[in-house]
């Protein structure tokens, strides 16, 4: 029988429930338990796929093509569990499912209500997502007290009652703000947050208290007294300069032991040797590299969360501190590329819409002409093809039809047909809905022998995750290849272009990929593409300093 750990948050949002859940998952996994994680989001969108990055941050894509919350990226990076569409659901999905059932007549003419129909659907989704795990960690998005979260909180309250205290554990994450004028941490917000939770019918078993300084023992005892939580289960979570230090911080306060005891689980001692090695690599780099991220969502770096984490992982595996410089592509359009001088490498990530595109193309041109290592991801690959077509192949008006439908040289166009991960044919048109209609999830790619891509991956065939609706136009690709562009990877069956590069005689490291390799990078193994990219940046740095 699967046991459940429910993680809620109080006082303010963005306290780090996702990191806390992922860190606990890492601890339980190190004790030999099979773990999975679920994220319940209270917004009414069916998924975050059409939400602005400024509103939601990154959209994390799973192997099965689900567009999900960025916390699922943390789950995969901290544990060996692979996420799927069963691991993230929203109020929109729950209500849509219930309404569809009502329209089919599944409720036999009954009045459909929040309780029991919505809460039953939530419980069903949780149990489906938790199948096969010893422990399922379920994170409830939002903050206790939000009206949107109430059906989710009621559902987990019912699960606590149905499954019993030996099979459920409730963790509440709160904030202890420091008031400079008083010179002390304040516990009252935590007390009121727990009071609100208890009014709903949930008594937390463990409190994780965020603070920017050590919480005095007397204050912890006070919190325990007023919240009805055991003193040893009032755990401080101090601000850390790296999220990868959190598992050890929680383990030192015996969080995993407290959870196992609450759930009546006999498990081996935790082995954190891998995490200690990773933190040591993070804290003792031998080099520093400067990499420019040229994008349009740089004011909210959460939009590139998996990318920035993938660069940190690559740094761990190359003994390097990777210093990311976020560059607004619109600023390049206004002021030129001088801001890129001195960079050891340039990366252009994915994105949507015309704003800032010419600035990205200017950055790509700078990287190509100055032999600066370049990695283009998704739109970053497409724009590398556009830049090559314009400045090398002589197609002066080359563009993507996403930005100029009337161009005479549409080197990038809408994908109208492709094979999904199950081999079924998917078709799209300009009139298709925006939500859930992209080429999504894990897709195979065959690499060309003798290419840099083949050398980097060390394999003839790979599977990477995708999220796009535009692709390189095969009808013009032969002209670009004749001018020196190398197609390093193609999708079998459809021959869609998946990777491009420049020959080593022209450029030491210039690679574009249509997929998103950042979604499969983790601190334990890194990702070969990012590791090679950082090594190329180091080589460029050493060449410049010679």
UniProtKB/Swiss-Prot annotation:
Modulation of this protein's activity: Allosterically activated by GTP, when glutamine is the substrate; GTP has no effect on the reaction when ammonia is the substrate. The allosteric effector GTP functions by stabilizing the protein conformation that binds the tetrahedral intermediate(s) formed during glutamine hydrolysis. Inhibited by the product CTP, via allosteric rather than competitive inhibition.
Pathway where it operates: Pyrimidine metabolism; CTP biosynthesis via de novo pathway; CTP from UDP: step 2/2
Residues that hold UTP according to the record: 13, 186-191, 222
Residues given in the record as ATP binding sites: 14-19, 71
Residues at the active site: 378, 516, 518
NCBIfam families: PRK05380.1, PyrG
Miscellaneous information on this protein: CTPSs have evolved a hybrid strategy for distinguishing between UTP and CTP. The overlapping regions of the product feedback inhibitory and substrate sites recognize a common feature in both compounds, the triphosphate moiety. To differentiate isosteric substrate and product pyrimidine rings, an additional pocket far from the expected kinase/ligase catalytic site, specifically recognizes the cytosine and ribose portions of the product inhibitor.
Entry protein name: CTP synthase
Organism, as annotated: Thiobacillus denitrificans (strain ATCC 25259 / T1)
Lineage start: Bacteria, Pseudomonadati, Pseudomonadota, Betaproteobacteria, Nitrosomonadales
